[in-house]
Amino acid sequence: MSVITINKVKKTDTAAEDGYCRRSKSSGETAEILKPLMQDIGAIDFFEITSLDRLGIPVYTIARPRAAWGGARIHTAAGVTPADAKAASLMSAVERFSSEYRNDAMEFSSYERLGLTRALDPAELILPRSLEIGEELHWVLATDLMSGFDTDTPEYGTDRGAESITEDFTLTDCAEMYIPANAVFHPYDPLGMAQQLFRSDSNGLGAGNTTEEAIYHALCEVIERDALSAAEKSRNLGKKVIIDDNAPQVLRNLLATFEKNGIGINLWSLPSKGAGVTVAAACDDYTTRDPAMLVTGSAYDLSPVNAAIKALIEVAQRRASRLNGEYADKNADQKSLLERAGYDRLKRINSMWFGSANAECDTCRISELPDPSTDYVNRDIGIILSSIRDSAEYVFVADLTKVMPAVRVVIPGFEISCVDPSRVKKTNR
């Protein structure tokens, strides 16, 4: 795997066309770049499923029937605009294809044999089991972005922190370390040579028009999952977010789409590490009272507005996926549980998200939340890295590029229990 560098990448100025998602290329351009690649990754049957849900929020899906065993075969995404939904669905297929092991270079060794300065201690990945001394694992080289920081660079939040990360911010001299392949590939198969450290997952996977874009999306997901895991463990959702009249029209319109269809939405700003905001959304379809439509969505972004929009879009995507029957075979037991529990009981079981006590929690206006996002992807990455330096000794990026830029971001110590309940951090945050 090649050494990762961070170079200058300006975001497109077509925010109005794309709704909210400012990439280095517009969503329309991105979709056109991605479409010819679908044959290369075995993706077929790209179509729209917007009409399955009364919301009318654009949703597209594409199938990848030859995905590795244990990997996702259906890739569904929603968007503010059709172009955004198309690009997100196609990019998701590329992301998951890229995460599958395809004769990538690996080392087979023990942590002790590789050396403490050359490899990450697997225990820092919040393992569900103890690691035997001398236990042999598969390892891959990954780039540690934190190693490229100038030690004189102030942290974000200090007087000079934000200004020190300029549009010319780059990282070109980062160190490499070995990290367990189990944390990189998904699905992960130890090929009969080693035991799994944990069940592999998709947390921290990202793809984009550029490596920087892929890293930003992956980095955001890792921070989001850390915040969501901590919130679920502590049962503290932070502050309820109010979408006030000063919020951008695109966000107000999106929220109104749910409300006019008889769907209640609650938004929270979860306690998160570093700059930016993790927004969680809970969707209560009190019109149909369908327990399967009690869904949540969450997203982290430097821009609070973008985080809120992405959380709502994830709710729309999950509703459409369930209506499309994507989980029917995989989660037959869960479907049966939902049917037996019913709407009211399921709300009580998930009272943290849907309980009446939430009405009494502290609130904040979306327009009053700090927005340190910039017009440059590289600068946004720099701001995030600078702001989490107290929480993250390492930020690893493994290059998974196959047909277009794709990465896996791994931040040791960041929580993951919302994805894998067996991996619970035992120390305080």
Question: Where in the sequence are the language-model features?
Answer:
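Helix-biased "structured C-terminal domain" signature
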Residues: 1-429
